């Protein structure tokens, strides 16, 4: 599936790149940090005991991301958690290219404003290498999910991976793309 018009990628090329070159003194466009991928992870603890749960959430994650998720499995057995090696524990999707830009656009402009008492995302959630992690409390805030079809509310993690070397560069990149950080 190809996308002819990707508004966030256009904004990146026309506004973000010149602004970042000016602010950080890059000599070449290719030095400017860019988005590499977005990983959406859904940890389903009860997935090891209930296979239907994995299937239901896989359909929801596929609707949200527009791409089939991969089932994540336990790497080793842990007796205290009643987990054996190879049991399904969650789902993940890796978005790149146009799908990644469209998901980020939807996240910034539609999903985050729907959160209750939303005053901006935490500016301290960077990992030290220019990647940003964000937790979402439920799947209902996405427009693709019908509230009456949801059997169980499930949160998810969204990790935005950039080519930025520092958190400062990554924060500026995401802010210029429209990410609403807390003041």
UniProtKB/Swiss-Prot annotation:
Gene3D superfamilies (alphabetical): 3.30.1440.10
Coiled-coil spans in chain: none
UniProt xrefs under InterPro entries: Ribosomal_uL5, Ribosomal_uL5_bac-type, Ribosomal_uL5_C, Ribosomal_uL5_CS, Ribosomal_uL5_dom_sf, Ribosomal_uL5_N
GO molecular function, one term: tRNA binding
Superkingdom of the organism of origin: Bacteria
Subunit structure: Part of the 50S ribosomal subunit; part of the 5S rRNA/L5/L18/L25 subcomplex. Contacts the 5S rRNA and the P site tRNA. Forms a bridge to the 30S subunit in the 70S ribosome.
Described purpose of this protein according to its UniProt entry: This is one of the proteins that bind and probably mediate the attachment of the 5S RNA into the large ribosomal subunit, where it forms part of the central protuberance. In the 70S ribosome it contacts protein S13 of the 30S subunit (bridge B1b), connecting the 2 subunits; this bridge is implicated in subunit movement. Contacts the P site tRNA; the 5S rRNA and some of its associated proteins might help stabilize positioning of ribosome-bound tRNAs.
HAMAP family attached to this UniProt entry: Ribosomal_uL5_B
Protein name (database record): Large ribosomal subunit protein uL5
Organism: Kosmotoga olearia (strain ATCC BAA-1733 / DSM 21960 / TBF 19.5.1)
């Amino acid at each position: 599936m190809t996308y002819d018009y990707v508004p966030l990628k256009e904004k990146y090329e026309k506004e973000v790149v010149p602004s970042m070159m000016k602010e950080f003194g890059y000599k070449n466009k290719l030095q400017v940090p860019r988005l590499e991928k977005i990983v959406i992870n859904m940890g389903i603890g009860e997935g090891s005991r209930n296979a239907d749960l994995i299937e239901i959430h896989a359909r929801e994650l596929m609707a949200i991301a527009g791409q089939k998720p991969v089932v994540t499995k336990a790497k080793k057995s842990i007796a205290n958690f009643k987990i054996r090696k190879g049991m399904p524990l969650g789902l993940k999707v890796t978005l790149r290219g146009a799908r990644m830009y469209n998901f980020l656009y939807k996240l910034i402009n539609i999903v985050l404003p729907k959160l209750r008492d939303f005053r901006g995302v935490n500016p301290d959630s960077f990992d030290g290498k220019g990647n940003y992690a964000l937790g979402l409390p439920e799947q209902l805030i996405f427009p693709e999910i019908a509230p009456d079809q949801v059997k169980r509310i499930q949160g998810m993690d969204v990790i935005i991976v950039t080519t930025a070397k520092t958190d400062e560069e990554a924060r500026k990149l995401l802010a210029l793309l429209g990410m609403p950080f807390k003041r």
